[in-house]
Amino acid sequence: METMNHICKLAGKCRVAGQEGHCSVFCTPFILLHGVEGKTGLWGNMNVPKKYRNCDLSNLPIKASNPVAYAWVSKYVNNVLENVQEGVGLFLYSIPNADNRFGTGTGKTTAAISIANEFMIARVIEASKGGRPIVENPVLFYKASELQTLYNSRFAGTFDMKEAADKKYYKIKKLLMNVELLVMDDIGIRQKITDSFENELTEIIDARDNKMLASIFTSNLPIEKLADTMGDRIASRISGMTEQIAFKGKDNRRGGIL
């Protein structure tokens, strides 16, 4: 029978990885993480874009360009279960410069997803060893712009389209409010959000803050400028529930790295 170590994200931490009779599609942790066919499971439902699914601390390409940020990420990952359980949040933001006026492509999203991936692996291992059971997917990645687009879609199109969008939005909103670790990417990239969407986002962030759930936010804006697009309430709450970590340097997306 074919072994699953070539696709299983647990392989690097599993003592029976690659061993016939043990490392197979019938492995319970494998099924939990990757699904029966190895294509879904918890790993496939994190909503992480395909290009980032293999990101982790070992291949995080910011060590030279952002050593302080790398040290923060490393410290978080090295104690990731406890950090998430204690609700330790992060705000990863860019410092623009002459060569990168908008602070894009500095590794914020890659770093945030690396933490999310590392946590998912650690969480599955914990549950597989008899620790806290996993009832719902413990990790969710969502772009702020996609959430706003989904929110707005509830008011456009036919009745059936609006009804479908409404159901999808509230399903996602519930996940955002309750998932163990949330990565919300690129907040503050649009012009000033509407009061109604600000209220929705505030409700989500408040719920997470009150439950002490860990949240990682990425932005091209420092926290003091976030209020210009997201409002004072959201900026204040994010500031109070996260450690702020600066990223600098050139736009590495031009070279296909990030």
In which residue ranges do the predicted regions lie?
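Walker A/P-loop nucleotide-binding motif
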Residues: 85-113
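A short, basic N-terminal segment
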Residues: 1-79, 244-245, 249, 255-258
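Short glycine-rich substrate-engagement loop in P-loop NTPases that contacts/grips substrate
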Residues: 65-74, 102-106, 110-111, 116-178
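Short loop/turn elements that form and flank the Walker-type P-loop nucleotide-binding site
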Residues: 85-86, 135, 176-179, 210-212
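Surface-exposed cleft-lining segments at the edges of enzyme active sites
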Residues: 59-64, 97-103, 150-153, 189-192
